[in-house]
Regions:
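Conserved, well-structured core domains of diverse proteins
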Residues: 1-114, 124-128, 329, 708-712
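Low-complexity, proline/glycine-enriched hydrophobic segments characteristic of transmembrane helices
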Residues: 48, 369-388, 591-594, 716-851
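Hydrophobic transmembrane alpha-helices
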Residues: 208-211, 246-247, 288-293, 518, ...
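Long, contiguous bundles of hydrophobic transmembrane helices that form the permeation core
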Residues: 2-18, 27, 317-510, 623-712, ...
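Hydrophobic mid-bilayer segments of alpha-helices in multi-pass membrane transport proteins
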Residues: 23-28, 60-75, 90-99, 125-133, ...
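Membrane-interfacial loop-to-helix junctions in multi-pass transporters
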Residues: 121-125, 188-201, 228-240, 272-278, ...
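Core transmembrane alpha-helical segments of multi-pass membrane transporters/permeases
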Residues: 136, 140-141, 151-153, 160-166, ...
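Hydrophobic transmembrane alpha-helices that form the pore/transport pathway of multi-pass ion
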Residues: 222-290, 296-303, 309, 570-609, ...
């Protein structure tokens, strides 16, 4: 997220106290409302009071946007000042109109549903009012670019029939009544899927992050990272990478990460020898990668899950390896920069531990935690068989026991000061002395991960329980520490906990103002696509420009994401590009004989939307880092993007090799993939940095690029030496179809690639060829599989002639390329079946790894030779 993450609205601090308190109070109400929505209390209270205290999904969206628009128009003043009194009046007036337009839908929901599609004058009035208000809110809080994009889509809906539109873009256009109803009065527009995800999921995760930050966890992670890594060469830079990664677990904002961790890490990086631009760039690269880190991954992660119909658990699994590899690679890049600059680390006052000691401690800790987790999971599974209530009480009891134990340990040490003190910089504290002060901060994160990954609860319910756990920590940590330190119990620790909780709730809601507005206006874009089919002609245009090349199309989509990301928030950018391009990429992939999972395409768009945060000339994260480092923001952005090139290649690789996403692979294959992907990233980083142990020779850089590519795409080389498919043509297809008992040998994905040839829809005299991927049921005869796929075939001489697929079948959309009613028929020319007797693609890992080792040894010899020469000179 970009401007979605702004914690304090522009000009917020210039308000008079009473106005600021009013906004803070509304923010508090919003957070409490969202917690109310996620809890079971409305159901219990409704049963007791006989009142309807439960809000359905549509009602929740309406109230959610009412809060977001109202706060957005109050907290973000007009950019061009006219008169203070008039400006204030306009803010209150616009906020009241926006809230009224949302609440109108809630109050008159039954009347509106009864006249579906037939709006009254008052319906149209409130629809237009709501659209104008959300447009003003977008302009004030998110800037002009997103407003322009949304306005263009609305203009196309209203005036798509005009002559200045190309023939391929024209559509019949919508009347004012139809457009207003579509965008405001139903769930196809503003109150659509995007706003629904914001209401049910995004808010709770943002709130959890705000509460965790307020509890002191952010400061704890920064100090722990410095205590662990600060003594290494270039320690502050390496600590920045780890701290941003830890912050990314609960924060989905690159700018928030830069502002939070960069305030401490950037000055220290400069102090150890990094230039202002490089210090800022390292923080930017670390923070943008924080948005890729599961489980939060920014607001777009939940939208990806919703749009692709992939469970949130699976999405986390798919995103885990790319995020891990990206962070390891960034850590390695920082290490290479440190070597080239000859930097040292910070001093520490504890003796160094041997590698064997560290490794033994790690294995022991990992085994102990794994064993405890296994025992707890087994215990919960066993008790859940006869009483889910008992399991719930047992879980709470375990949480309380662990929490009290962690607080007791933390109470033995003084509380951590905010930021790094001069004493800590001059003499780094031991890891243990810092770690024990904040074990209790890890418990809410464990609750979140346990609920999502082990218990498989919904994202919203997982975030709800995690939020409750951190609320409990906020309220009790100070009183309990005072109790364990044998201090006299006063009201002050309780008061401080309550104030921290209130501020955390307010901070979470403030962070959501722009997210709610962005997801609301994004509904206009999605609504336009659903109403007009705009994605079809845009997809056809991009497909024409790319000449049907999947690689070129991916490059164009990447540039589109980067360019739009310069002006749009990550969430809106992702929605725009994925809505228009995701189906086209999947289709073009099929035509090129490649099965591209929809979730991989959405992650591709998501990655490049995030990378726009440090892409000059606009990258907002780069500007935030430059403000702290006092460096040049453009140079910071360029340097940051050069570090992020390693992240930019990952989406291209996992489109062609979905193993990188751990997509449908076993444990052993997954383990091998993790090792090779990390090694590939290290090789690529050595190539782009032109350094491994010493400076690369030209041939070494070239070899490292080839090694990286081979580890990412071993199938590329295999396809060059062995045909990937068996081809079945003409009479062979006829024989297969005629034999009802024939079971075709399919590949492990139960898919085949089919080539069609027929008259072009736009020019029937021209024959065109198209490839499609069809998923078959492996256990059925060929003829049954073909019918289920929507292939209606007839035999004409030696040709297999295809009739037009029925609407709703898998091939209906893809086959629009052909004219089925021309003089020449559409024929099924070839079926391609993956060969099962090919060499394993993993065989190409062996030479790649061997060459990598040889390069390493060669550079090691060169370094030793250089060191001996230097010693002889001395």
């Amino acid at each position: 997220m970009k401007s979605e993450s702004v914690l304090l609205p522009r000009k917020y601090n210039s308000r008079e106290p009473s106005f600021g308190k009013a906004i803070s109070f509304i923010c508090l109400l919003w957070s409490l409302f969202q917690l109310w929505l996620a809890s079971d209390f409305p159901f219990y209270l409704s049963e007791i009071t006989k009142l309807n205290l439960v809000f359905n999904s549509q009602e929740a969206r309406q109230i959610h946007l009412a809060f977001g628009l109202g706060l957005g128009l109050l907290a973000y003043p007009a950019i061009n000042k006219i008169n203070p009194i008039l400006d204030k009046f306009s803010q209150f007036f616009l906020a009241a109109l926006a809230v009224s337009a949302c609440i109108y839908l809630y109050i008159y929901k039954l009347d509106i549903s009864n006249r579906a599609g037939l709006p009254t004058s008052i319906d149209v009035f409130f629809s237009i009012t709501g659209m104008i208000c959300i447009g003003i809110a977008v302009y004030r809080s998110l800037g002009l670019p997103l407003l322009i994009v949304a306005s263009l889509f609305i203009f196309y809906v209203m005036f798509g029939h005009l002559d200045f539109f190309p023939e391929s873009m024209k559509w019949k256009g919508a009347s004012l009544n139809k457009a207003s109803w579509h965008f405001w009065m139903q769930t196809e527009g503003v109150f659509g899927v995007a706003l629904g995800v914001s209401t049910s999921m995004i808010f709770l995760f943002v709130l959890f992050g705000a509460l965790l930050e307020k509890s002191g966890a952010g400061n704890y992670f920064i100090k722990l990272s410095f205590a662990t890594l600060g003594h290494l060469r270039g320690g502050p830079a390496k600590a920045a990478v780890v701290a941003s990664g830890l912050s990314g677990i609960y924060s989905g904002s690159s700018i928030a990460n830069v502002v939070t961790t960069g305030t401490f890490t950037i000055p220290l990086m400069k102090k150890t020898g990094f230039s202002s631009e490089k210090a800022g760039a390292i923080e930017v690269a670390s923070s943008t990668n924080g948005q890729l880190t599961p489980p939060v991954m920014g607001a777009a992660a939940f939208l990806i899950s919703e749009f692709t119909d992939v469970s949130y658990f699976d999405l986390i699994k798919y995103a885990a390896l790319p995020a891990l590899a990206s962070y390891i690679a960034l850590f390695y890049i920082v290490h290479l920069e440190v070597i080239k600059l000859g930097l040292k680390g910070l001093k520490r006052n504890t003796p160094a531990r041997s590698f064997l000691n560290k490794f033994t401690s790690f294995i022991f800790g990992f085994t102990a935690l794994g064993s405890i987790g296994f025992i707890i999971n087994f215990l919960f599974s066993w008790t859940n068989n006869f009483s889910s209530t008992f399991t719930f009480m047992l879980a709470i009891s375990l949480f309380l026991i662990l929490y009290l134990f962690c607080i007791w340990i933390a109470s033995k040490k003084p509380d951590l000061e905010i930021g790094l003190t001069d004493e800590e910089i001059n003499n780094l504290p031991s890891v243990k002395s810092v770690a024990v002060t904040g074990y209790h901060y890890l418990l809410p994160i464990v609750v979140l991960l346990w609920c999502v990954l082990i218990s498989r609860l919904s994202p919203s319910l997982s975030a709800y329980w995690a939020s409750l756990s951190i609320i409990f920590v906020l309220l009790t940590q100070n009183p309990l520490k005072a109790f364990f330190r044998y201090k006299k119990l006063t009201f002050d620790p309780f008061k401080q906990g309550a104030l921290d909780l209130i501020e955390g709730l307010q901070k979470g809601a403030r962070s959501m103002i722009t997210i709610s507005i962005a997801t609301g206006i994004a509904g206009v874009i999605i609504g336009t696509v659903s109403l007009t089919g705009a994605h079809q002609f845009i997809g056809e245009f991009v497909e024409t420009v790319s000449s049907g090349s999947l690689v070129l199309m991916l490059v164009l989509v990447a540039f589109m994401s980067l360019i739009l990301g310069m002006g749009l928030p990550t969430t809106a950018n992702y929605i725009v590009v994925s809505s228009l391009m995701a189906p086209v990429i999947v289709m073009v992939g099929a035509q090129n004989g490649l099965i591209v999972p929809l979730v991989a395409v959405h992650l591709f768009v998501f990655y490049f939307g995030i990378l726009a945060d440090d892409t000059p000339p606009v990258g907002l994260a780069a500007f935030a880092a430059a403000a702290i480092s006092k460096g040049d923001p453009i140079k910071t952005g360029i340097q940051g993007f050069s570090y992020d090139i390693r992240t930019a290649i990952l989406p291209f690789m996992f489109i062609f090799n979905t193993d990188i996403l751990l997509f449908n692979i076993g444990f052993i294959s997954g383990l091998l993939t993790i090792i090779t992907v990390v090694l590939a990233m290290l090789a690529f980083c050595s190539a782009i940095q032109n350094h491994m142990i010493v400076k690369n020779k030209i041939y070494e850089t070239i070899l490292l690029v080839v090694i990286s590519f081979s580890l990412f795409r071993p199938d590329f080389w295999l396809d060059k030496i062995q045909e990937p498919f068996d081809k079945i043509q003409g009479n062979q297809i006829f024989e297969l179809i005629k034999d009802n008992n024939n079971i075709l040998n399919l590949n492990e994905n139960n898919t085949v690639r089919v080539e069609f040839v027929g008259p072009d829809f736009d020019n029937p005299d021209k024959l065109v060829s198209q490839n499609s991927i069809i998923i078959f049921d492996k256990n059925e005869p060929v003829n049954k599989r073909i019918e289920k796929a929507g292939l209606f075939l007839n035999v004409n001489n030696n040709d297999i002639v295809m009739d037009e697929p029925f609407p709703g079948t898998a091939l209906f959309q893809e086959m629009k390329t052909f004219d089925f009613y021309a003089d020449k028929p559409v024929i099924l020319k070839t079926i391609y079946i993956s060969k099962n007797d090919r060499l394993p693609k993993e065989i190409f890992f062996i030479p790649s790894i061997l060459v990598f080792i040889l390069i390493y040894l060669n550079q090691h010899i060169r370094r030793n030779k250089h060191n001996r020469t230097q010693n002889e000179k001395k």
